[in-house]
């Protein structure tokens, strides 16, 4: 439970504003740069980076809704219909980011460890098709926000009422009933397993072997090795800081049969991903480096 007014909500609002201020221009800049390069000659990594940037922009475009929610003391002063839409886009972008970060690690791993085989089989069309599958995977899983609020025969947003500044205001996607929790918590555990743990495991394996293979080759320039290490470190920090705490809350909630009180704070960390991803873009794309 969060106080409806006071330091915690203002802290959340400040983090959202900082994330938007830093992340939005950086991601727009990166998207335009990558799109310009892709128009001349598209590569597999460019396609994946464009999708990762698009996922970040999706989060950032709906972040103002979360700002309004925080400014209103964690209540929802906007039309009720916008609540599931805003949360669907917000949560989808989180898992899209983890999936495309994992896809980038696979692309880097195959290109270094199996260069000849991968070069012969690498096709932009295949990467585009895989990207569509990842979008469908994340969005289909996160569509539970449209179902869970009405599970049990009541509209959660309309039903949860709290008092803020002396007037009634609704809470958005919060304070689930027992019936709703019995529906939501197992699905959250699946999100942890399929959309976080699996991509994270793949990413660790790929970048560990990617960096090891590069460092073992004396003919690779030192600058390229440093970029590889920087890319791996930035990605691991992103997973560890932005995604891991929030997804661990899924496991804790499933075990305890209720959402942990600190869940709202670790959800806050996921938004920082949109501000940290440009660091990954810098290490991943020479076009972005030249543009900067």
Spans of model-derived segments:
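Intracellular effector-coupling site of seven-transmembrane GPCRs
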Residues: 54, 160-184, 189-196, 208-248
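Intracellular signaling interfaces of 7-transmembrane GPCRs
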Residues: 31, 35-47, 108-130, 166, ...
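Loop architecture of class A 7-transmembrane GPCRs
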Residues: 1-3, 70-95, 114, 120-131, ...
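Hydrophobic alpha-helical segments of membrane proteins
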Residues: 61-64, 140-147, 197-205, 235-252, ...
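First transmembrane helix
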Residues: 7-37, 58, 64, 201-207
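Seventh transmembrane helix
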Residues: 241-250, 265-292
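Extracellular TM2-ECL1-early TM3 structural module of rhodopsin-like
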Residues: 5-17, 40-104, 111-121
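Hydrophobic residues within alpha-helical transmembrane segments
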Residues: 14, 18-21, 51-54, 64, ...
């Amino acid at each position: 439970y969060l106080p409806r007014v006071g330091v915690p909500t203002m802290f959340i609002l400040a983090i959202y504003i900082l994330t938007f201020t830093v992340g939005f221009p950086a991601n727009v800049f990166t998207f335009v740069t990558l799109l310009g390069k892709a128009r001349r000659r598209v590569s597999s990594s460019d396609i994946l980076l464009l999708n990762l940037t698009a996922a970040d922009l999706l989060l950032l475009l709906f972040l103002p809704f979360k700002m309004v929610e925080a400014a209103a003391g964690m209540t929802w002063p906007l039309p009720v219909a916008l609540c599931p839409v805003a949360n669907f886009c917000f949560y989808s972008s989180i898992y899209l980011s983890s999936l495309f970060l994992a896809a980038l690690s696979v692309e880097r791993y195959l290109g270094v460890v199996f260069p000849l085989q991968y070069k012969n089989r690498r096709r932009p069309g295949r990467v585009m098709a895989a990207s569509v599958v990842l979008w469908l995977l994340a969005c289909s899983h996160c569509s539970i926000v449209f179902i869970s609020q009405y599970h049990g025969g009541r509209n959660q947003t309309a039903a949860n009422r709290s008092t803020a500044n002396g007037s009634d205001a609704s809470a958005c996607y919060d304070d689930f009933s027992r019936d709703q929790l019995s529906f939501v918590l197992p699905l959250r555990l699946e999100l942890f397993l399929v959309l976080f743990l699996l991509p994270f495991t793949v990413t660790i394996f790929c970048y560990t072997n990617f960096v090891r293979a590069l460092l073992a080759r004396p003919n690779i320039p030192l600058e390229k090795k440093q970029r590889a290490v920087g890319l791996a470190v930035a990605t691991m920090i992103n997973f560890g800081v932005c995604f891991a705490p929030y997804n661990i809350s899924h496991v804790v909630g499933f075990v305890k049969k209720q959402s942990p009180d600190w869940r709202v704070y670790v959800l806050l960390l996921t938004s920082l991903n949109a501000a940290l991803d440009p660091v990954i873009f810098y290490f991943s794309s020479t076009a972005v480096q030249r543009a900067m």
